[in-house]
A protein has these predicted regions:
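Extracytoplasmic "Venus flytrap"/periplasmic binding protein-like
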Residues: 101, 105-178, 213-216, 315, ...
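Ser/Thr-rich, Proline-interspersed low-complexity disordered segments
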Residues: 16-20, 26-75
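Conserved C-terminal helix/tail region of periplasmic/extracytoplasmic solute-binding proteins
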Residues: 49, 213, 431-486
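Extracytoplasmic/periplasmic substrate-recognition and gating elements
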Residues: 213-215, 289, 297-304, 338-404, ...
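Hinge/lid segment of periplasmic solute-binding proteins
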Residues: 63, 67-73, 144-202, 344-351, ...
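Long, aromatic- and glycine/proline-rich binding clefts that accommodate carbohydrate-like moieties
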Residues: 177, 347-350, 398-451
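Glycine-centered hinge/linker elements that transmit conformational signals in sensory
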Residues: 230-232, 265, 276-307, 352
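Extracytoplasmic/periplasmic solute-binding protein
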Residues: 185-198, 203, 228-280, 321
Length: 486
């Protein structure tokens, strides 16, 4: 049997390999499309959207002249616009229906064509392919960090400030005020608003209340120590019952997703992870080492386990996990799984344990307009504005789940939301909700963070290796960003 390489060399090799993969998957986009001199891309944006307006404006009559940053409306007739998104299943089917409805009802003669990318990374690859491709989109629904990247590194995304604030073709002040400030800020860079929130989601902890009560726990955990105690109790029961098949299960299913790791870090008190000029990630902090060590102790003691499949919802329904970490959009799937597997257990969702306040971290998809011709940009914006109307946002919320992106959308979806106790619970966490890092570099940093966390949980890595892992974590993020010109 071969001896493994020294730990420092091994960690460095893994992080370098991670950097290579990320450079391949996240290469900067190609040359930006050629934009006519009269396009909206030539207009300097000046509207600040970080402060919501206090009240709505009255309905106005149609203008007699087209604003300078728009095109004559007659030029919109016959414009064919491609809308690409990462949704699938029922949500993608609903998007198809909405696009068809827009095509039939819009007064400008705009024709939208929808393209299902399949995933956010596939969509990024499509944009990276350049505007000469036949399926290159003019409007997208994409993660905020991707929109920010296309704005800052490639000049592919169009700032929307002027369009949003236009008194006739923009969003009303009330519509802007209805969208939570934290959602607006996720799509901002240097005063430019590059996106309109479409769907927001967050990692949550699924928790089996019935099983926990049988284990002797009357209340859900509110601290990390409580969380570990309950997970260990569930693991002990499964390892000492008469069924050998469930040995090694029962606690928390390990989830190394970057946003889940970031949520754990925030629950342990991570601060100032973005600092400097330009902003850089700083995860090499004592709190990160403490967080990694806590989860590692759960793994070492058998209270957290790596699942063989991605079906955490089924493990949960079968009492092979007291906890697992999923997304708010997974609520319908878990309900259907419990019904299918005939589980009678009561379950709920929890924020990440902090002890003082609920810790939740929100991210998601936003509508964005990619640079093209002036007529295409205007047509794309009018579709985004239509999709962002409260009634359409409410429909997307009802179909795709997640958090309401505006107060008006929440009110319109109130009946369905109130029928789901877990959904109602999530709304109560809105006041303390935190944002995923609202910077373009998060699309890189989240995967490097994920890899470093995974390394810290391996049996051949010792606690003494953690400082090196964290040092390499920050260095690798900087290295990959530099390779991509960021």
């Amino acid at each position: 049997m071969q001896n493994r390489p020294p730990t420092q060399q091994w960690i460095t090799v893994l992080l370098v390999l991670t950097a290579v993969v990320l450079v391949t998957a996240c290469q900067p986009t190609g040359e930006p499309p050629v934009v006519p001199t009269d396009s909206t891309s030539q207009v300097e944006t000046s509207v600040e959207l970080t402060q919501p307006a206090p009240e709505s404006t009255p309905t106005r009559l149609a203008p007699t002249a087209t604003p300078a940053y728009l095109v004559p409306l007659a030029e919109l007739n016959g414009q064919e616009i491609i809308f690409s998104h990462p949704w699938s299943g029922e949500t993608a089917d609903w998007i198809d229906q909405m696009v068809d409805s827009f095509n039939q009802s819009n007064e400008w003669g705009i024709h939208m064509m929808v393209r299902r990318a399949g995933s956010s990374m596939a969509l990024a690859d499509r944009v990276k392919g350049g505007n000469l491709a036949a399926d290159y989109p003019q409007v997208v629904a994409a993660p905020s960090e991707h929109l920010l990247s296309w704005l800052e590194y490639g000049n592919l995304a169009l700032p929307l400030n002027e369009l949003i604030a236009d008194p006739y073709f923009g969003l009303t002040e009330q519509q802007r005020a209805d969208i939570p400030l934290v959602f607006w800020q996720q799509d901002q860079s240097g005063g430019n608003q590059v996106g309109i929130p479409a769907q927001r989601d967050m990692p949550v902890i699924f928790y089996n209340e019935t099983w926990a009560a049988e284990l002797g726990f009357a209340e859900p955990p509110t601290t990390a120590d409580d969380f570990k105690a309950q997970a260990c109790a569930a693991a002990f029961v499964n390892s000492h019952d008469r069924f050998a098949a469930n040995d090694g299960t029962g606690g928390w299913i390990v989830n190394t997703d970057g946003l889940v790791v970031y949520s754990w870090l925030k629950s342990f008190g991570l601060k100032d992870e973005l600092a400097g000029s330009p902003l850089q990630f700083h995860y090499d902090q004592p709190v990160t080492q403490t967080t990694f060590a806590f989860v590692r102790s759960m793994v070492d003691e058998g209270c957290a386990w790596f699942s063989r499949t991605t079906a955490s919802n089924e493990y949960f329904a079968n009492r092979q996990a007291l906890f697992y970490t999923g997304n708010l959009t997974d609520l319908p799937l878990q309900a259907k799984t419990n019904t299918r597997l005939e589980s009678q257990d009561s379950w709920t969702i929890l924020p990440f344990p902090d002890g003082n306040r609920p810790v939740t971290v929100v991210s998601g998809l936003s509508y964005g307009v990619l640079r093209s011709s002036a007529a295409q940009e205007t047509a794309a914006w009018l579709f985004v504005r239509w999709m962002s109307q409260p009634e359409n946002s409410a429909k997307l919320l009802a179909v795709g789940g997640g958090l309401p992106v505006s107060t008006a959308a929440a009110e319109l979806a109130r009946t369905q939301m109130d029928s789901n106790p877990q959904w109602v619970l999530a709304q109560q966490w809105m006041p303390t909700m935190q944002s995923a890092p609202p910077v373009a570099g998060w699309r890189i940093a989240r995967f490097v963070l994920q890899d470093a966390f995974w390394q810290s949980l391996q049996s051949f890595v010792t606690l003494e290796d953690f400082p090196l892992i964290l040092e390499q974590l920050d260095a690798t993020i900087v290295e990959v960003q530099a390779q991509q010109g960021q």
